Amino acid sequence: MATELPYDLTPELAPLSWLIGSWEGQGRLGDGSAGTEIFYQRVDFTEHGLPFVEYRAESWLCEADGTLLRPLTVESGFWQVDRARRDGDVGPGMRPADIVPAFRSAEDVEGLRAGDQGFGLTATITHPGSLSELYYGRIKGPQLQLATDAILRGSAAGPYHR
């Protein structure tokens, strides 16, 4: 099925466009075996006219029928096509991007494709309790793979288990 892109979507977000919106579902904590607690998660991907999507996920413990019991956690971050920084990019900090995006067309973005491997992907995710993660991976059509590259742990963070 073809994905219809909004006419005003930043071209660089085309590979991520199918993620934009809300996703939700249930799973099991730990190794996922029977008897482990069930959780519900809602994930939102939002675009703001910049070359990244904002990510936010909220999780709750729940009953098998979906009745929410209590909040588990919240995490947030940013996902983008992995590429070298250009002079016209936003940041660091509040420094605005150039009015003309670094990649102006689908043809420009296609230059970032790694052959049949799709596009490189970077995700930064921050958790409560002074923990941040950096992921690298690939996005190819409606499939993505991510692997943890780096962890930043503050004094309030507990041990990290991949």
Which residue ranges define each predicted feature?
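Soluble ligand-binding/transfer domains with enclosed cavities or grooves
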Residues: A2-Y7, L13-R162
